[in-house]
């Protein structure tokens, strides 16, 4: 899930809430060897992927990844793509072969400058959702308390404690709560997924702006599953027995519309 919003809009403050939990794994720096390493001097399970199972991965700023050289950036995105699918298998010239299987959640944050790199995310295929944060002056003032004031550290610690309790509580809730998704909403979300998959298909153009290879849109199956999971998760959060048209579905609709590039 990508959270996109202006600088000072509360993205970092929001994500910082969850960094104190044992169920989260914040990552501040990425290299092509961060997730898995081919260094024979390190244990075979030394890569970060082996610490990420069943955790929420938090990347507070995606800009450094986007600004990397194409080769390194491509390798990182390739590893993330495979990791999303639950299996990463890599071989290095050092003779090491590494295999990882598992699952995790990931939330990353970026400013609207990410739109300049939107085609980069086509390398992740259909494996992401995007939410554009809506902030007003009141929200910005509330989050600004993290930056100023004599009680800054106390406030940060309090927010991290709340975030940790939140993750602990809902880890148990998701294993015992299974909100019902009506068939008509499954059908609606499926049609929405197919539409958005087409609308966010990258179009490759040459220097003269002529279309090169005809664009190949996603099938939309994975996107539909993600939107249904998002709506279902919202139902768990709201303690609702089922996904409703005017509640949880609207969150899925918002995320779907935010996935459509504007440039």
Regions found by a protein language model. Name each.
Residues 1-140:
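Conserved ASCE/P-loop NTPase catalytic core
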Residues 6, 26, 43, 64, ...:
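Proline-rich intrinsically disordered, low-complexity coils
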Residues 2-14, 241-257:
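Short alpha-helical "patches" and their helix-cap loops
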Residues 257-263:
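Short amphipathic alpha-helical interface segments
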Residues 27, 57-59, 65, 76, ...:
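Weak global preference for isoleucine
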Residues 99-102, 118-253:
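Phosphate-sensing "switch" segment of ASCE/P-loop ATPases
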């Amino acid at each position: 899930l990508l959270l996109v919003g202006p600088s000072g809009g509360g993205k970092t403050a929001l994500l910082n809430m969850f960094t104190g939990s044992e169920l989260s794994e914040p990552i501040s720096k990425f290299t092509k060897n961060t997730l898995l390493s081919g260094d024979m001097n390190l244990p075979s399970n030394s890569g970060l992927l082996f610490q990420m199972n069943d955790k929420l991965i938090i990347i507070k700023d995606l800009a450094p990844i986007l600004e990397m050289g194409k080769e390194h950036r491509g390798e990182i995105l390739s590893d993330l793509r495979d990791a999303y699918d639950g299996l990463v298998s890599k071989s290095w010239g050092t003779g090491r072969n590494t295999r990882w299987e598992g699952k995790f959640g990931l939330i990353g944050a970026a400013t609207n400058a990410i739109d300049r790199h939107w085609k980069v995310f086509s390398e992740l295929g259909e494996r992401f959702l995007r939410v554009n944060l809506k902030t007003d002056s009141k929200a910005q003032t509330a989050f600004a308390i993290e930056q100023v004031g004599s009680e800054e550290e106390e406030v940060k610690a309090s927010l991290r404690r709340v975030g940790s309790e939140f993750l602990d509580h809902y880890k148990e809730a998701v294993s015992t709560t299974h909100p019902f998704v009506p068939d008509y909403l499954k059908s609606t979300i499926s049609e929405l997924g197919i539409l958005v998959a087409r609308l966010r298909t990258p179009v490759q153009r040459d220097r003269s702006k002529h279309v090169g290879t005809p664009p190949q849109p996603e099938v939309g199956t994975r996107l539909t599953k993600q939107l249904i999971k998002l709506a279902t998760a919202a139902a768990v959060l709201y303690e609702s027995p089922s996904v409703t048209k005017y509640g949880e579905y609207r969150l899925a609709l918002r995320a779907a519309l935010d996935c459509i590039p504007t440039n």
